[in-house]
Amino acid sequence: MATFSQKPAEVEKKWVIIDAEGLVVGRLASIIAMRLRGKHKATFTPHVDDGDNVIVINADKVVFTGKKYSDKVYYWHTGYAGGIKERTARQIIEGRFPERVLEKAVERMVPRGPLGRRQMKNLRVYAGPNHPHEAQQPVALDVAALNKKNVRSA
């Protein structure tokens, strides 16, 4: 029997919605990255974008474990000499675009390159509880029920 290889025309993409309230960032990002790549399917093929479309709501209510909320630092460079910039996770979550923390975590778990960029376009992250994708009839995925460590206990 020959090895199965998914053809791009045969791909069936589902829509999944995840409520990120109270979930641990890294664990949630790992599950989202797996869904975006399609590794949860038996038909996974490394060179084909056969992952699902993922909608994440309440991304501003994700949590970190330990002291990462105040100590984790995100760096970027402007391109100018001496242009290194930094922000803590707390500054980003309390700032204008709190969903970027989760977007960056997922982006860094998806392979870099043309396929990874295409798969990242299937991710939609919203800071609040509202999203404009009701017409797609997304299926809810309860990440908290998958493992008790996915939710931070006080």
Swiss-Prot record:
A molecular function GO annotation: structural constituent of ribosome
CDD domains linked to this entry: Ribosomal_L13
Function summary: This protein is one of the early assembly proteins of the 50S ribosomal subunit, although it is not seen to bind rRNA by itself. It is important during the early stages of 50S assembly.
Family to which this protein belongs: Belongs to the universal ribosomal protein uL13 family.
Protein name: Large ribosomal subunit protein uL13
InterPro entries assigned: Ribosomal_uL13 (IPR005822), Ribosomal_uL13_bac-type (IPR005823), Ribosomal_uL13_sf (IPR036899)
GO cellular component labels: cytosolic large ribosomal subunit
Disulfide bonds: none
Highest classification ranks of the organism: Bacteria, Pseudomonadati, Pseudomonadota, Alphaproteobacteria, Hyphomicrobiales
Alphabetical UniProt keywords: Ribonucleoprotein, Ribosomal protein
Subunit: Part of the 50S ribosomal subunit.
Domain of life of the organism encoding this protein: Bacteria
Gene Ontology biological-process entries: negative regulation of translation; translation
Transmembrane segments: none
